[in-house]
């Protein structure tokens, strides 16, 4: 699915990291659930709702997460960021006001070599607070 999203459709936000489902750089949402696109056949997406990092740009969760990641310095090289944000968006769609422990658990399948995880977790927790105050689920 990752090759189709990037090469055919032109949605290049979904990254190729390991190709084995270990790093989370290729995370997308399929019917609201996070999946590693490198392990998903494109044909399996037929008739399903697929959301990439580009799709989150118009979504309030995506906007708030983007702002929180910038505010907390949760981005350095940026390679892992799309997968992290997509994974965090799925968490915030199902969990109001996640604490740090819940946020850490949610991103266990996403690897970051540059920033480390504390700033990312802080960004997710803050985004959850903002969205809860706004009444966004």
Q: Locations of the language-model features?
A:
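Signature of N-terminal electron-transfer/Fe-S-associated modules in redox systems
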Residues: 2-137
């Amino acid at each position: 699915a990752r090759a189709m999203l990037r090469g055919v459709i032109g949605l290049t936000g979904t990254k190729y990291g390991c190709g084995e489902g270990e790093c989370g750089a290729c995370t997308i949402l399929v019917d609201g659930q996070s999946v590693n696109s490198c392990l998903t056949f494109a044909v399996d997406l037929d008739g399903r709702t697929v959301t990439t990092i580009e799709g989150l740009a118009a979504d309030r969760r995506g906007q708030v997460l983007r702002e929180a990641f910038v505010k907390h310095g949760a981005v350095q090289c940026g390679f892992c960021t799309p997968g992290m944000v997509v994974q965090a968006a799925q968490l915030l769609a199902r969990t109001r006001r996640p604490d740090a422990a819940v946020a850490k658990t949610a991103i266990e399948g996403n690897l970051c070599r540059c920033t480390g995880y504390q700033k990312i977790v802080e960004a997710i927790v803050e985004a959850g607070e903002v969205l809860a105050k706004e009444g966004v689920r």
